[in-house]
């Protein structure tokens, strides 16, 4: 204040240049003011942001969201039904065929092993006729 008394052309001190309103308040009061400003929730802030768009844009965005939600629900229901139909059809139509082929292969493997045991090890490889004599070793 002494500088103000010295005259209008006198240089000001650093204390006089700083703003006095916030400098006198303690930090706790400043934090409380910030907390008071942040009391609104995220949904309130988002709702407040919608007011900056015209009603026509908001209604179009809402209709688009509703339509996309409806389509997503329909696609989900359809995919569930299609998956159920595909899975049950596979189990009824394809699995019995797979099991029978596996059973047939196992029976053929057992017959081949029995033939090897009864007729010798080369019989299974040459695929000779049943009841025929085994081939002589060393001759093809």
From Swiss-Prot:
GO terms (BP aspect): protein insertion into mitochondrial outer membrane; protein targeting to mitochondrion
Cell location: Mitochondrion outer membrane
Biased segments, Acidic residues type: 25-40
Compositionally biased intervals (Low complexity): 1-11
Transmembrane helix keyword on record: yes
TM spans (from-to): 82-101
Keywords per UniProt: Membrane, Mitochondrion, Mitochondrion outer membrane, Phosphoprotein, Protein transport, Receptor, Translocation, Transmembrane, Transmembrane helix, Transport
InterPro entries per UniProt: Tom22 (IPR005683)
Record-listed Phosphoserine modification sites: 13, 43
GO cellular component: mitochondrial outer membrane translocase complex
The name this protein goes by in its record: Mitochondrial import receptor subunit TOM22 homolog
Source organism of this protein record: Bos taurus
